[in-house]
UniProtKB/Swiss-Prot annotation:
One of its GO terms (biological process) is 2-deoxyribose 1-phosphate catabolic process. It is an enzyme of class 4 (lyase). CDD domains: DeoC. GO terms for molecular function: deoxyribose-phosphate aldolase activity. Its EC number is 4.1.2.4. It catalyses: 2-deoxy-D-ribose 5-phosphate = D-glyceraldehyde 3-phosphate + acetaldehyde. It comes from Halorubrum lacusprofundi (strain ATCC 49239 / DSM 5036 / JCM 8891 / ACAM 34). The keyword Magnesium does not apply. One of its GO terms (cellular component) is cytoplasm. Belongs to the DeoC/FbaB aldolase family. DeoC type 1 subfamily. It is found in: Cytoplasm. This is Deoxyribose-phosphate aldolase. Catalyzes a reversible aldol reaction between acetaldehyde and D-glyceraldehyde 3-phosphate to generate 2-deoxy-D-ribose 5-phosphate. The gene is deoC. The active site is at residues 90, 151, 176.
Length: 215
């Protein structure tokens, strides 16, 4: 994978509760300058939409970080995010519903968001909290709901992306590996395992580790 293609697979991310507009500006500038995407909190989308040095793709999160919003709230949050300029939506499932065996409710919630916005929806299943069977069922719900991608983690649970989880999830949909990916080597390992996108707060270091960076 050449340097530009590799950079375009990175979602350079800032989503902490203490995130300021200044932090978002830094992420936008770094993403644009290095050819990455950006993933930012929804409250900063209006400013980001008007920002001069913005990357081509700006993603945001819905139902973040625990996924326990009411379904209608998630749908409305997604619509607002799209209206405010989001190019992609990263949606957190209700893990409790999944663990209780309410897979139809999980799929319906995802479907509501997918139907409400004309942009790609990535479904965050929070792998660190799930058994392998639950991971498979979460991916099946995402497939049933016509989601575009499944994503490993929010970064707020213990544990992040693993090679094993990426391999499992990629049997169902394209995968975004997120959580604990901090170097070029780690990102490449995830891509080799089947991921098509990487979410990371250390996107600059990851891209600068590519052998073709600076050519």
């Amino acid at each position: 994978m050449d340097r530009d293609e590799f950079a375009a697979s990175i979602d350079h991310t800032v989503l902490g509760p203490e995130t300021t507009w200044g932090d978002v500006e830094t992420i936008l500038n770094e993403a644009a300058d290095h050819g990455m995407n950006a993933c930012i909190p929804p409250c900063y989308l209006p400013e980001a939409a008007d920002y001069e040095n913005a990357p081509k793709t700006i993603a945001t999160v819905v139902g973040f970080p625990h996924g326990q919003h009411a379904p209608g709230v998630k749908r409305d949050e997604a619509v607002t995010a799209w209206d405010d300029g989001a190019d992609e939506i990263d949606l957190v499932i209700n893990v409790g519903r999944l663990k209780a065996g309410e897979d139809d409710a999980v799929a319906a919630e995802i479907s509501d968001v997918v139907a409400a916005v004309p942009v790609p929806v990535k479904v965050i299943i929070e792998t660190a909290l799930l058994s392998d069977d639950e991971k498979r069922r979460a991916c099946e719900a995402a497939v049933e709901a016509d989601a575009d991608m499944v994503k490993t983690s929010t970064g707020f649970a213990d544990g992040g992306a693993t090679i094993r989880d990426v391999e499992l999830m990629s049997e169902y949909l394209p995968v975004k590996a997120s959580g604990g990916v901090g170097s070029y080597e780690e990102a490449t390992a995830m891509l080799d395992a089947g991921a098509v996108r990487i979410g990371a707060s250390s996107g600059v270091a990851i891209v600068e580790g590519h052998p073709g960076d600076g050519d």
